[in-house]
């Protein structure tokens, strides 16, 4: 039986075996990525790598990278819903992470749409009271509907997830995580353009 196996391997050829092995790795990785359960943390993407984060997979990955942030975190979000009644609300946890990072000296800045100020003023109050710089976009006539997080000038989360409990745990939402300093620079420039023309929330 062993001799038969060796003969088969010889017949297939090393190149074909390597190709099959690599194909197996790719298929295995794809399956693991796309059937991962809610909140599953994927390993860091290679430079230029892209991860698809559907539904609640976004939250686990975002917290993974926020926990490792040491330089900067820039957030642009249409709606951020802080709810002081529920400490374990996933949005509350994200905001606490931002506050903790800011107090450690990380450059944390947040831009939200007026809808956050109107519907969820506790969000603004919590961030401002803890010193985190927050701005609204340049005019009430402008809607900031983007949902972006840029971490350490390298990791970009961009997609449909607002920071609400529903978006993070229930809704069908999609976001891409891109590991690219080049893209991060472009998106940071976009963030800075909104930030520089933004309004204080008070």
Which ranges hold each PLM region?
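Short, flexible loop segments at the rims of nucleotide/cofactor-binding pockets, characterized by
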Residues: 49-55, 85-87, 134-136
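Solvent-exposed loop/turn segments at secondary-structure junctions
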Residues: 79-83, 114-118, 139-143, 155-156, ...
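Short, surface-exposed coil-to-beta transition loops
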Residues: 142-146, 170-172
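Short acidic active-site motifs
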Residues: 61
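N-terminal, intrinsically disordered, polar/charged segments of Gram-positive cell-envelope systems
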Residues: 37-50
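Primarily the HKD phosphodiesterase
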Residues: 65-132
């Amino acid at each position: 039986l062993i001799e038969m196996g060796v003969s088969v391997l010889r017949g297939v050829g090393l190149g074909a075996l390597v190709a099959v092995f690599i194909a197996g790795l790719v298929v295995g990785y794809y399956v693991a990525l796309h059937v991962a359960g809610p909140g599953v943390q994927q390993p860091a993407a290679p430079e230029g790598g892209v991860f698809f984060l559907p539904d609640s997979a976004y939250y686990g990955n975002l917290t993974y990278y926020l926990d490792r942030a040491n330089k900067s975190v820039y957030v642009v979000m249409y709606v951020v819903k802080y709810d002081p009644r529920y400490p374990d609300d996933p949005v509350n946890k994200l905001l606490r992470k931002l506050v903790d990072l800011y107090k450690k000296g990380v450059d944390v800045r947040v831009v939200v749409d007026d809808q956050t100020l109107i519907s969820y003023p506790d969000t603004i109050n919590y961030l401002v009271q803890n010193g985190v710089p927050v701005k609204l976009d340049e005019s009430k006539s402008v809607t900031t509907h983007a949902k972006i997080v840029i971490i350490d000038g390298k990791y970009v989360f961009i997609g449909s997830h607002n920071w609400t409990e529903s978006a993070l745990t229930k809704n069908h939402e999609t976001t891409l995580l891109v590991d690219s300093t080049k893209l991060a620079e472009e998106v940071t420039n976009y963030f800075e353009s909104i930030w520089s023309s933004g309004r204080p929330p008070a």
